Structures are given as C-alpha cells and as structure tokens.
Amino acid sequence: MCGIGGGDTVAATAGRTLPGMTLLLGDADIQSVFGWRDAIEALRAAYLTADDGVADHGARYPARSIARGDTGWLRVLSGVPGHGGLMGAKLIAAAPPAGQVSYLIALFDQGSAELVALADGNAITGYRTAATSALAADLLASPGPLTVGVLGSGFEARKHLLAVAAVRDVVGARGL
C-alpha cells in the first residue's frame, strides 16, 4: 500500500495515510487483507440498509453509464451512501478484441470531496461477486450442509466455492 500526494510517495500502514494523501491499493494489497466472513457480513449489513431511507434511491445510485468505441467500452457505476463517509465510483474498461477487462475503484470523502483511495478493482470485483452469491445461498438455502453447483472452472468459480464454504458446510461441489 502506498499513498501519493503533491508528488511525494509514502508508505501507508494499516490502511492509513498522511492527511491529504491518497491510498493506492493494488490486487496484492486487497488479497493480503481480504476475509470472506468480513466481506459477507459487510454485504449483509449494506443490503439491509440499502435504501438509506431515501425516496429516490436512483439519485444516490444512478443507473450505470456506458460509453462505446470501435474496439472497447467504458462503464461507470457510482454511489453516494446516505450515511456520509465515503462515496465512490467503479470504472470498468473492456477491450473485447484483446480479451481484456480492467477495473478501477475511486473513493472520495463526502464532506471534503478529497480523493481517499484508488483501488485496482479486479480482485475486489471477484470477491464481491462471490460474497454476494454466498450471502444469497446462506439466506435462501435450507439449513444444513450444502452441495454446491459451480458453472465454469476459472477465477470466479473458485471464488464462489470458497465464499459459500465460508458461511456454510460444503459437502460436495458439482461442475455444471
């Protein structure tokens, strides 16, 4: 982890930076602190308070925006939670001919508009997707051990199986 600001680079510890410094997080940083149970519980809390008591939820979390070019596209998802704190945006860039997708997450302080963090969103996206599936399985499946059906065999499939195993006893997995 490192912070940047005013041309200086400093090491950040325990996710803290000096005032005015932006925290830069790469995939390795995310992986080094990630925990399935923490992620799933954070999502559980977020989904329980998702409406923030706001009548126009779309004002806080507008529909995604997509810009398309000849060889790629850029999608933006943004949100401003009602509790204050941070607001953010996730950018997804895709170049289908190159078979490449990249993600960037930017977090800002709602009170000051200060850029707090920039994170490579590749690992975060995989973890969040799998943690959401695990939360759904935990809430919707009958109590007790599970046999999990998995589509595919890549990064997402492996992450989904690990996430479900963090909240339930998995007695088997079947490729579908």
What is each residue range found by the language model?
Residues C2-G6, V10-G126, A134, A141-G144:
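N-terminal ligand-binding/catalytic initiation module
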Residues T22-L25, A165-D169:
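Acidic/polar active-site rim loop that often engages polyanionic ligands
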Residues D29-I30, D120-I124, V150, V170-L176:
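Flexible, glycine/proline-enriched loop segments at strand-loop-helix junctions
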Residues S133, A141-V167, A173-L176:
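Glycine-rich adenosine-cofactor-binding loop
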